[in-house]
């Protein structure tokens, strides 16, 4: 049985204005991960990802490079207990 996890992910660098959130949603849906992603006022992007550990980890790994126009300088991951509170993966504003 695969363990389910939650990860709070903060991505730093040139990650706003480059479709990072849109592509994160596409990747999340492809991986069957649920949660959200949003822009932060300081220029970072933050997400909450839930799902099978291998799928969440794959999305976190994708965040280390993001879409082609992004420049990722750092990814901070806080691993949390799975809550199962999301049915979809979407952009929050």
Swiss-Prot record:
Gene3D superfamilies: 3.30.70.100. It catalyses: an acyl phosphate + H2O = a carboxylate + phosphate + H(+). InterPro entries: Acylphosphatase, Acylphosphatase-like_dom, Acylphosphatase-like_dom_sf, Acylphosphatase_CS. The active site is at residues 21, 39. It comes from Geobacter metallireducens (strain ATCC 53774 / DSM 7210 / GS-15). This is Acylphosphatase. Keywords: Hydrolase. It is an enzyme of class 3 (hydrolase). The keyword Transmembrane does not apply. One of its GO terms (molecular function) is acylphosphatase activity. NCBIfam families: PRK14438.1. Its EC number is 3.6.1.7. It comes from the Bacteria. Residues 6-93 form the Acylphosphatase-like domain. Belongs to the acylphosphatase family.
């Amino acid at each position: 049985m695969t363990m389910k996890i939650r990860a709070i992910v903060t991505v730093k660098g040139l990650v706003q204005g480059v479709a990072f959130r849109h592509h994160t949603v596409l990747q999340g849906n492809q991986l069957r991960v649920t949660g959200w992603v949003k822009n932060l006022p300081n220029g970072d992007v933050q997400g909450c990802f839930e799902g099978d550990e291998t799928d969440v980890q794959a999305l976190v790994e994708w965040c280390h490079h993001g879409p082609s126009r992004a420049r990722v300088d750092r990814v901070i991951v806080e691993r949390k207990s799975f809550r199962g509170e999301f049915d979809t993966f979407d952009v929050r504003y």
